[in-house]
């Protein structure tokens, strides 16, 4: 009997000892003998993903999303290549960017990273280049500049509606939360492009409609999901239980229900013969293209595609417009020069002008380029997998095949060797002659580069040109207590500002 009572304790001790020895040996190997041990970095990074989680989730109360900035500081001390995981290297060298993300790059997307987004059946998450090309077949003509130009009247309706809301709030003596307003504007534009019908986010009294709020709250939760993938298992629990455990599960469920409702509504409208006057994302997704290998996705695939397009088109464009407008109205010299240029094609605040005319304005173009650089709305790193054969860096160090390697758009846009005084909003840097501007433009990468770059680039540019031009020409924004400190941000997948950009939106008289 005594032997039986002691035996379980002995087994537990043996198991615990084996576990401890295994992890001790693994730690020694990872830190000192792994092929990636030649790269400097925190020893904690070599041991697991939780070093990154510390900086993105819990570095200190009230301040998260600091990994991006910690990497910047470490690169300046330790060099252009850092170890940031058991199987990951982060690169800071701008010259490597166009190798990693060029067209035809052999560095494929890491499936595990992009499935964190919660839309595993989307084109964005597809890592296989052949399947990715097939998935893009219906999307490329839809996002072409020619097709996007046909959307101009629809986009103009939303800009006018946004202006009306600004007038209403000014008449009530209420300041506008510009970030929420501009995200609502972007949401209405991209949702009508996706479904043929706007979500009418601009109608919300505070610009905080459910879809805008859900995306605002869901994206920061991806840091938690990346660090603790088992959180997704909560989706299998009844919602009333899961949402008590994790707010991100509730937000994810809201997103799925939102997309499913929109698909059902679109199908019902199409069955009733109600079709939009312009091509929509849903319409194109429902047309097979057998010669290009594209088959119509199932409902989950449609849902995932719609969620990624709307998410990418709402937050990022809204953030870029928010940062750009703040810096215009916070800098009198930039403001006055831009307004004077706009008056050459828009003689009165009520003037309408074509997108192509706006696109031809050099200072407006410089302001928008600088806004995209300065805001870096998709700032985080985008990891790829090192191809077979590995890669040798210019300094001779070797990265084995299968290693995750990535760079961050923010680190390119704020690199002092590429952009002098990068923390200064300076549109003049884009007006220093064609050769200098062309060289700098190689490293303006808000939409990434290569075959995996953002499909929505033409739509985003049109939205920015129209929003910036018409708001600046129509309104004299009076900042209400907003400072540059408020516009600093944490990397919560997309920038999350420390404060709020509030402004009284007074109509110009001339």
UniProtKB/Swiss-Prot annotation:
Signal peptide coordinates: none
Cofactor(s) needed by this chain: heme
GO MF term list: heme binding; iron ion binding; monooxygenase activity; oxidoreductase activity, acting on paired donors, with incorporation or reduction of molecular oxygen
Pathway info: Secondary metabolite biosynthesis; terpenoid biosynthesis
Bilayer-crossing regions: 7-29
Locations listed in the record: Membrane
Keywords (A to Z) from UniProt: Heme, Iron, Membrane, Metal-binding, Monooxygenase, Oxidoreductase, Transmembrane, Transmembrane helix
Gene Ontology annotations for the cellular component aspect, listed alphabetically: membrane
One GO BP annotation of this record: terpenoid biosynthetic process
Pfam families in the record: p450
Membrane topology field: Single-pass membrane protein
Alphabetized PROSITE patterns for the sequence: CYTOCHROME_P450
InterPro entries per record: Cyt_P450, Cyt_P450_CS, Cyt_P450_E_grp-I, Cyt_P450_sf, Cytochrome_P450_monoxygenase
Disulfide bonds: none
EC number of the protein: 1.-.-.-
Binding-site residues, heme: 454
Note in the entry: The macrophorins cluster contains a single gene insertion (encoding for the terpene cyclase macJ) compared with the yanuthone cluster that produces the linear compound yanuthone.
Protein family according to the UniProt entry: Belongs to the cytochrome P450 family.
Function: Cytochrome P450 monooxygenase; part of the gene cluster that mediates the biosynthesis of macrophorins, isoprenoid epoxycyclohexenones containing cyclized drimane moieties. The first step of the pathway is the synthesis of 6-methylsalicylic acid (6-MSA) by the polyketide synthase macA. 6-MSA is then converted to m-cresol by the decarboxylase macB. The cytochrome P450 monooxygenase macC then catalyzes the oxidation of m-cresol to toluquinol.
UniProt protein name: Cytochrome P450 monooxygenase macH
Organism: Penicillium terrestre
Species classification: Eukaryota, Fungi, Dikarya, Ascomycota, Pezizomycotina
The gene coding this protein: macH
């Amino acid at each position: 009997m005594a032997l039986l009572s002691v035996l379980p304790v002995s087994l537990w001790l043996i198991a615990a000892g084996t576990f401890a020895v295994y992890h001790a040996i693994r730690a020694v190997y990872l830190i000192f003998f792994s092929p990636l041990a030649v790269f400097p970095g925190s020893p904690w990074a070599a041991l697991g993903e939780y070093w990154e989680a510390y900086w993105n989730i819990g570095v200190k109360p009230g301040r998260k999303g600091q990994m991006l900035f910690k990497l910047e500081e470490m690169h300046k001390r330790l060099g252009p290549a850092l170890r940031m995981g058991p199987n990951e290297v982060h690169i800071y060298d701008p010259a490597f960017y166009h190798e990693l993300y060029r067209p035809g790059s052999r560095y494929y997307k890491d499936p595990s990273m992009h499935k964190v987004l919660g839309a595993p059946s989307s084109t964005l998450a597809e890592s296989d280049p052949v399947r990715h090309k097939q998935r893009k077949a219906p999307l490329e003509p839809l996002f072409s500049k020619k097709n996007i130009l046909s959307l101009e009247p629809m986009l103009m309706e939303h800009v006018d509606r946004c202006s009306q809301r600004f007038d209403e709030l000014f008449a009530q003596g209420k300041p506008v939360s510009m970030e929420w307003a501009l995200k609502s504007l972007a949401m209405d534009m991209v949702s009508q492009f996706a479904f043929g019908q706007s979500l009418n986010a601009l109608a919300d009294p505070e610009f905080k409609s459910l879809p805008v709020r859900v995306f605002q709250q869901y994206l920061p939760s991806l840091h938690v999901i990346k660090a603790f993938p088992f959180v997704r298992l909560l989706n299998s629990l009844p919602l009333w239980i899961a949402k008590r455990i994790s707010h991100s599960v509730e937000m994810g469920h809201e997103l799925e229900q939102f997309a499913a409702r929109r698909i059902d509504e679109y199908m019902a409208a199409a069955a009733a013969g109600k079709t939009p006057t312009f091509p929509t994302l849903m319409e194109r997704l429902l047309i097979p293209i057998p010669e290009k290998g594209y088959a119509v996705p199932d409902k989950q695939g449609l849902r995932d595609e719609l969620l990624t397009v709307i998410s990418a088109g709402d937050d990022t464009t809204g953030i870029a417009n928010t940062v750009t407008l703040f810096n215009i109205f916070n800098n009198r010299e930039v403001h006055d020069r831009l307004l004077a240029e706009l008056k050459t094609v828009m003689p009165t605040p009520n003037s309408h002008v074509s997108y192509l005319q706006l696109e031809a304005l050099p200072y407006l173009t410089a302001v928008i380029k600088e806004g995209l650089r300065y805001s870096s709305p998709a700032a985080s790193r985008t990891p790829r997998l090192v191809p077979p054969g590995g890669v040798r860096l210019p300094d001779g160090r070797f990265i084995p095949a299968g290693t995750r390697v990535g760079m961050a758009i923010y680190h390119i846009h704020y690199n002092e060797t590429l952009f002098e005084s990068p923390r200064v909003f300076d549109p003049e840097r884009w007006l220093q002659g064609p050769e200098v501007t062309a060289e700098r433009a190689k490293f303006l990468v808000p939409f990434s580069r290569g075959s995996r770059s953002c499909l929505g680039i033409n739509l985003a540019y049109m939205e920015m040109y129209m929003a910036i031009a018409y708001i600046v020409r129509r309104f004299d924004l009076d900042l209400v207590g907003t400072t540059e400190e408020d516009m600093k941000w944490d990397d919560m997948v997309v920038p999350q500002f420390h404060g709020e950009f509030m402004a009284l939106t007074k109509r110009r008289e001339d």
